Amino acid sequence: MTNFNESVWVTTAVKKEQFPESDAIEIVLSGRSNVGKSSCINAICEKKAMAYVGKRPGKTRYLNFFKVNDQLWLVDVPGYGFAQRSQTELKSYGILMEDYFNTRKQCKACLLVIDSRHGLTADDQDMLDYILEKNYPYRIVATKCDKLTYSKKLAIKKELEGLYGADCVILFSALSKEGRVDLQKWCASQIDETR
């Protein structure tokens, strides 16, 4: 049994030389800016403020590594689609992401975090295409689902599963904790499935 509440922040990396040494598998949380990736990490790990949650989009600008245990780490990556970044920042973000995905053999699975109220955006679709191209196991995490009616929750789940297959979506709310156990189970299952 994986004890997520024993998770700890390990380090922040600005460039690939700062990626930490580890034999654990890594699950990346990717998504647009301000979609709830940090809140998702905090909920998975049963901590209130392990990952910084910013009020403004674009606060996570580097890779943040979180150790769940010796076999599993979570990686919070900068959000995409935030227009108020300079060209220099966008270029360094692109290099950092390429370095991570192309050189980090520990990266074994992805959680694509989307805002359930907006569905899959064009940027999300691009990221999902990349995940599929890399052949990573994945789940689409539809956050902020506490703001949707029951019928709208069912509709987004049905729509995405119709496109990408059964069980590809986890409805999630950091507020109500809906979906947290499903996320924890899926993350823990990747330890054996991706080794």
Task: Give the positions of each predicted feature.
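Conserved G1/Walker A P-loop phosphate-binding module
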Residues: 1-84
